[in-house]
């Protein structure tokens, strides 16, 4: 930020950028021109949701992660039937969120791995909505990640990347952030 030192700098700045009245007038003029040049479009509604799925784990052990709680012989007695029920319950809630228009984009937290998302999007009632997904592979010790599922006919994924959270002293690694760029399709 520079400080203006004299009237000459002030007048040069106003010539270069215009004063506030000029900028407002140009902005309004551009808005009016753009409004006339763009044909009227109907309002298109889409829904966005974010959900902590609270330990969406499969029933297999990942030797690189601490997922022992969610195995068939572990303390939670996590088995295939409970896993399938959880997938079904999540699918039911997702479709209910949108009433007749299920969410176009859904951010999911606490997803274990790249196995549970195909089970959720392709082997559950969500398969009819043609959801696709992108997810992180975080250094979290329990193996939980974040993901975005999206309806392919409503959203075009352009790019995605994981953003690591710095680990501070006396803290353990945690889930990465998921940064996604895309286009809403009309």
Locate each region found by the language model:
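Short regulatory "switch" loops immediately downstream of catalytic or recognition motifs
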Residues: 1, 58, 97, 183-185
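Bacterial Sec-dependent N-terminal signal peptides
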Residues: 1-43
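Context-gated lysine
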Residues: 5-7, 16, 65, 84-86, ...
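Compositionally biased, intrinsically disordered low-complexity regions enriched in proline and serine
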Residues: 10, 15-18, 69, 81, ...
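Short charge-dense sequence patches
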Residues: 18, 42-45, 66-72, 162, ...
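N-terminal, active-site-proximal structural segment of metallo-dependent hydrolase catalytic domains
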Residues: 38-130, 134-144
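Structured beta-strand-rich core segments of catalytic domains in phosphoester-bond hydrolases
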Residues: 111-186
């Amino acid at each position: 930020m520079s400080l203006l030192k004299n009237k000459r700098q002030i007048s040069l700045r106003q010539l270069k950028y215009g004063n506030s009245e000029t900028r407002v007038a140009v902005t309004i003029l551009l808005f009016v021109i753009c409004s006339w040049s763009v044909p009227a479009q109907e309002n298109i509604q889409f829904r966005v949701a974010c959900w902590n799925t609270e330990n969406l784990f499969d029933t297999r052990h990942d030797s690189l992660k601490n997922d022992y709680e969610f195995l068939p012989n572990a303390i939670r007695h996590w088995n295939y039937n409970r896993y399938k029920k959880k997938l079904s319950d999540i699918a039911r809630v997702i479709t209910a969120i949108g009433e007749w228009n299920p969410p176009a984009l859904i951010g999911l937290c606490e997803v274990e791995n790249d196995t549970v998302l195909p089970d959720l999007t392709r082997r559950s009632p969500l398969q009819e909505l043609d959801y696709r997904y992108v997810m992180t592979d975080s250094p979290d010790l329990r193996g939980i990640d974040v993901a975005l599922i999206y309806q392919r006919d409503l959203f075009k994924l352009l790019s995605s990347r994981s953003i690591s959270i710095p680990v501070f002293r006396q803290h353990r690694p945690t889930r990465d952030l998921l940064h996604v760029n895309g286009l809403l399709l009309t």
